[in-house]
């Protein structure tokens, strides 16, 4: 039911943008972003609390509808390294996005939502022989797909009309996740190329 309401809301925003402007499609933009942040959470079943700063990369592509609305897609991968022994929690996610932006001088603040999905995997190595290609004595591995809602806030800085710097803050929500995935805020920095 929630998915249907979110889809209807996104379609409503798109058509309201179309009704506001005579020239509906005002171009497109896209770019790459690096991110970090702080994630924490307990992984049930193995009793491990994962926390720390993830590192990741991804990108976005959007169509500009009217003066303020943009729709498109984005995708990212994020890795949270643990225990300094090769242990990790990794996320890959993406989806369709809609956002509202408003230019104020050289700044373009924006807010939006991405709806999609992804996959999370984790490898926690509790003990291994210490030798390269050594045998693992005690390790846990898990992998799971998830439905993703990703609300975000950001701001672009217009270097030129074709090149913008962007900074974005989000919190990836995974409703209905079966095992406790670490979550928390992420901050993104990157370039957006406009046409």
List where the protein language model places each region:
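Cleavable N-terminal export/targeting peptides
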Residues: 1-25
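Outer-membrane beta-barrel pore domains and translocons
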Residues: 17, 33-39, 76-78, 114-118, ...
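Short glycine/proline- and aromatic-enriched beta-strand/turn motifs that initiate or cap beta-hairpins
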Residues: 19-65, 71, 194-195
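Outer-membrane beta-barrel translocator domains and adjoining extracellular loop/strand segments
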Residues: 40-48, 82-88, 122-130, 177-184
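Extracytoplasmic loops and strand-loop junctions of Gram-negative outer membrane beta-barrel proteins
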Residues: 40-44, 133-139, 171-173
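Short sequence motifs at beta-strands and strand-loop junctions characteristic
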Residues: 49-54, 88-92, 141-148, 181-183
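Gram-negative (and chloroplast) outer-membrane scaffold detector with strong preference
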Residues: 63-135, 147-149, 157-163, 192-195
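Outer-membrane beta-barrel "beta-signal"
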Residues: 182-195
